[in-house]
């Protein structure tokens, strides 16, 4: 009986720790997101050209990434961490900052750019399955919009095509 009680206590402590990590990650993401959204808006305002009379923004402005898709994604530093942009999934009411470089410790804070670049259409974003991060992705139906906004304010829109859940040991 003592061993059973010990195991039950350990399980409860582990569950409490996981919930605490989830909340801490969510709180951190919210705080960083506020700063990044402000930085993105500031970057947009600084980079907009003066438009000739009668010309639309789309006609007058070609983003740097179109001219040079191999360029590094711009980063913004918040609390000593470099971020690549913001991931938005409207169907899940999810807005998350994306850290520019993947590591296990970074995953505890926010989703991370695991590999690739949004400019080359091969970016992979990794995140924990915290409810405040990617924990609800399994509920995302096919055809839903996923938006990534880089730190220059360029918006990239996608639709989910299929859902694949990988083994934790893949």
Give names to the regions the model predicted:
Residues 2-170:
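Solvent-exposed, non-transmembrane regions of membrane-associated and secreted proteins
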